[in-house]
């Protein structure tokens, strides 16, 4: 994979907005010192995070997806 595009990731993520949130969250984790899932490369964290999404190794948690859609049913403090 020479370049990672949105189209490479969209089959694995519901929509472009969710992809942006997922990629940004993973990039922040990598910058904070999280271990990369893929082999070490000279890619910057945002590119590496999209590569991880494109391979299907990074996915949205169901609770996050429901919270973003406004349908979260978890135990929320009242």
Swiss-Prot record:
Catalytic activity as recorded in UniProt: RNA(n) + a ribonucleoside 5'-triphosphate = RNA(n+1) + diphosphate
SUPFAM superfamilies documented for this protein: RPB6/omega subunit-like (SSF63562)
Family in the record: Belongs to the RNA polymerase subunit omega family.
Residues annotated as transmembrane: none
Enzyme Commission number, as recorded: 2.7.7.6
Protein name: DNA-directed RNA polymerase subunit omega
GO terms under biological process: DNA-templated transcription
GO MF: DNA binding; DNA-directed RNA polymerase activity
Keywords on record: DNA-directed RNA polymerase, Nucleotidyltransferase, Transcription, Transferase
Domain of life: Bacteria
Subunit structure: The RNAP catalytic core consists of 2 alpha, 1 beta, 1 beta' and 1 omega subunit. When a sigma factor is associated with the core the holoenzyme is formed, which can initiate transcription.
GO cellular component entries: DNA-directed RNA polymerase complex
Main enzyme class: transferase
Function, in words: Promotes RNA polymerase assembly. Latches the N- and C-terminal regions of the beta' subunit thereby facilitating its interaction with the beta and alpha subunits.
Biological classification of the source: Bacteria, Pseudomonadati, Myxococcota, Myxococcia, Myxococcales
């Amino acid at each position: 994979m020479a370049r990672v595009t949105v189209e490479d990731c969209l089959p694995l993520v519901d929509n472009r907005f969710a992809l942006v949130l997922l990629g940004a969250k993973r990039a922040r984790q990598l910058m904070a010192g999280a271990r990369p899932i893929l082999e070490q490369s000279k890619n910057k964290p945002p590119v590496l995070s999209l590569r991880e999404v494109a391979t299907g190794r990074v996915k949205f948690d169901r609770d996050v997806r429901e919270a973003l859609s406004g349908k979260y049913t978890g135990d929320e403090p009242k």
